[in-house]
Amino acid sequence: MSLREICSQELVEFKGNKRGIIVNIKREAPFEEIQEKIINKLEAYVGFFNGAKISKINSDCLTDMEILELKEGITSRFDVEFVEDQKIEENSNFPTKYVNTLRSGENIEFEGDVVILNDMKPGSKVLSKSNTVVMGDINAGAKVVAGGNVFVMGKIEGFVHAGAEGNEFAYVVAGNLNPKILQIADNIAEAPDDEENYESESEISPEIAFVSNGRIVIESYLSKLDK
């Protein structure tokens, strides 16, 4: 890997598994920069991470003391819990389906919540009667249909339908909303042809789409939280 490729690599990546959120430090950087990136991501998605469980911080460059300092800084500012040293009891009555990888052409259909732990490949499809969370991107050609809300950590370039059973109070949140078609209940919107490309990591500002006065409105997620 060239120096340019290393420098352009995303510094902090959030993934997930059945135990909780995994924070991956992708390359070496000063501790203060790593801490700032993690805090910024948590603040950007504060509504999603409130009450979340973080199972691990993966890093080849941080010392044990620095990781401990990161944990203390995170728990002092956010309603999150580190659970790597605890046993998480699984409740079979809690209707959530976790999917590690959704391959091209693969379909998932579930009555409860669905959590996709990686990107959705073109041709993949999720049908959920409740909420759907995607820890990566919904790529062009992928499709999500949810009876409830849809929350995406990355970008949306595929088809998303929230409130599929007629719930006009449903909403869609994503790091970047650029879907081929976005539908909430019976309201449909298509992205304009001149939609800007996916923003760089430093410019990410999560967006929320919801129905207002019979049409789909897209606003900054953070400004919506402040209202």
Swiss-Prot record:
Assigned keywords, A-Z: Cell cycle, Cell division, Septation
Highest taxon of source: Bacteria
InterPro entries given in the database record: CAP/MinC_C, MinC, MinC_C_sf, Septum_form_inhib_MinC_C
Keyword Cell cycle: yes
Similarity remark: Belongs to the MinC family.
Task performed by this protein: Cell division inhibitor that blocks the formation of polar Z ring septums. Rapidly oscillates between the poles of the cell to destabilize FtsZ filaments that have formed before they mature into polar Z rings. Prevents FtsZ polymerization.
The protein's assembly and partners: Interacts with MinD and FtsZ.
Protein name: Probable septum site-determining protein MinC
Gene that specifies this protein: minC
